[in-house]
């Protein structure tokens, strides 16, 4: 009987923990998949490639990661990366920094939001 109660309690706790996961986490899972598919040609989370590393980008000043050789335009932009600035950047980088090196654009607002939520979730840790 004690084993049955223990197993039932474990199952109930697992059920509660699984279904109490915040909705933002679900978005982050899709965002991670989109990030890996759409962004990792140039970016990594923790290492520099042809683009800067992106873990911790939320709250970071533009052009401020010392491990990446930013353009003069990006260094002089002086914005802080948040949902709004990242959305503008991913929509049309040229509108924020003319003659930048990022030739990539994302027209799908839902995909941008998922990737931004994913990057934000990584910056919160």
List where the protein language model places each region.
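Solvent-exposed, acidic/flexible segments
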Residues: 28, 32, 47, 79, ...
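Short Fe-S-cluster ligation motifs
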Residues: 67-87
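Bacterial N-terminal signal peptides
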Residues: 9-19
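Positively charged n-region of N-terminal signal peptides that target proteins for export
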Residues: 1-4
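Short glycine/threonine-rich turn/loop motifs
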Residues: 28, 52-72
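Cleavable N-terminal signal peptides
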Residues: 12-13, 23-25, 29
């Amino acid at each position: 009987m004690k084993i049955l109660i223990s197993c039932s309690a474990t199952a109930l706790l697992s059920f509660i923990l699984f279904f109490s996961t915040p909705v933002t986490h679900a978005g982050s899972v899709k965002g991670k998949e989109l990030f890996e598919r759409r962004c990792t040609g140039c970016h990594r989370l923790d290492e520099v490639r042809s683009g800067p590393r992106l873990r911790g980008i939320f709250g970071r000043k533009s052009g401020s990661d010392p491990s990446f050789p930013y353009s003069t335009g990006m260094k002089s932009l002086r914005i802080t990366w948040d949902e709004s600035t990242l959305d503008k950047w991913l929509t049309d980088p040229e509108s924020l920094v003319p003659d930048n090196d990022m030739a990539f654009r994302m027209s799908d607002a839902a995909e941008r939001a998922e990737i931004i939520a994913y990057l934000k979730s990584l910056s919160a840790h």
